[in-house]
């Protein structure tokens, strides 16, 4: 499929909307009423610090809702107001935040069900309204919904769309897209659907493994087994890794994405020489500004004198998970929670998710005496949720 041609035709359809329905001013007011917090605003104005009794709170200087998330959430709410009686569907979670998704369910927005990773669109009918989430949707899903006669409300973050343009450029010039991401993540599934040949690498370790293979030091069967769910149909590592371009899932760790780009640039330089580098490697710049800002702020926060650190965001949120990883590199006692309800004031306990593990209960997690607590949140977490967490910490400390 010519994905660029399809997207152009879709954008000209009278059943497609990527601008929403309200003015920017009205949209900002609605979000402020729903999700902003006077407490958080006050802490921002006070240099991102807040002291109450023995508790000293230090907020990251960039956290919470990014503008892409704000736009997606606002457009989803506007859609229900604009279509008060129609069937409204959404192809996935609008963002990785349980409270926001629960609110959409209360507005009678239906979530497309999936079994074994395959979505069931059989109940979606002609004239229904379908919201595409901030992560985007695969080009095959868009085509199916358009052919069904649905009204498509596209809340895809423009930074994600930028990555789609990048992999389409790779395809046009017959380069294989090396996508730094999680192959099951909604955003990476969408991005890979716009690519030609592609290979998804999770981290620097996998990138180095691929690099070694390109330089003739790997085993084909082992390679194919290792990446069996992470490459395009018909992918041949002996042919399709001679010309590569790098792209990324926008919520991945910025520093790792940059290093992966350098790995493949050095690999192609070594294999083909400097005079042929541009014929075998395409440079990239698909790192999201908001992701970069939040990760940079987290690196600054973990350099503070902290006793514990609380990271707030959906457990399936990639950008939140990477914030947790940064805390771990500094050996700070950190706790990843998705809602304030994970904290029990009465028990001084927290039900949290250690990186790569199942949920576990930590009792007496807030130490006695004066305590410095660092707090940050993922790009899908509203300020009100952060404020509710702080209020619980204050109640425990008092």
Curated annotation (Swiss-Prot):
Gene3D superfamilies: 3.40.50.11270, 4-hydroxy-3-methylbut-2-enyl diphosphate reductase, catalytic domain (3.40.1010.20). The active site is at 187 (proton donor). Keywords: 4Fe-4S, Iron, Iron-sulfur, Isoprene biosynthesis, Metal-binding, Oxidoreductase. Pathway: Isoprenoid biosynthesis; dimethylallyl diphosphate biosynthesis; dimethylallyl diphosphate from (2E)-4-hydroxy-3-methylbutenyl diphosphate: step 1/1; Isoprenoid biosynthesis; isopentenyl diphosphate biosynthesis via DXP pathway; isopentenyl diphosphate from 1-deoxy-D-xylulose 5-phosphate: step 6/6. [4Fe-4S] cluster binds at residues 66, 157, 288. Pfam families: LYTB. Its cofactor is [4Fe-4S] cluster. Isopentenyl diphosphate binds at residues 96, 185, 317-319, 380. It comes from the Bacteria. Its EC number is 1.17.7.4. Belongs to the IspH family. Catalyzes the conversion of 1-hydroxy-2-methyl-2-(E)-butenyl 4-diphosphate (HMBPP) into a mixture of isopentenyl diphosphate (IPP) and dimethylallyl diphosphate (DMAPP). Acts in the terminal step of the DOXP/MEP pathway for isoprenoid precursor biosynthesis. This is 4-hydroxy-3-methylbut-2-enyl diphosphate reductase.
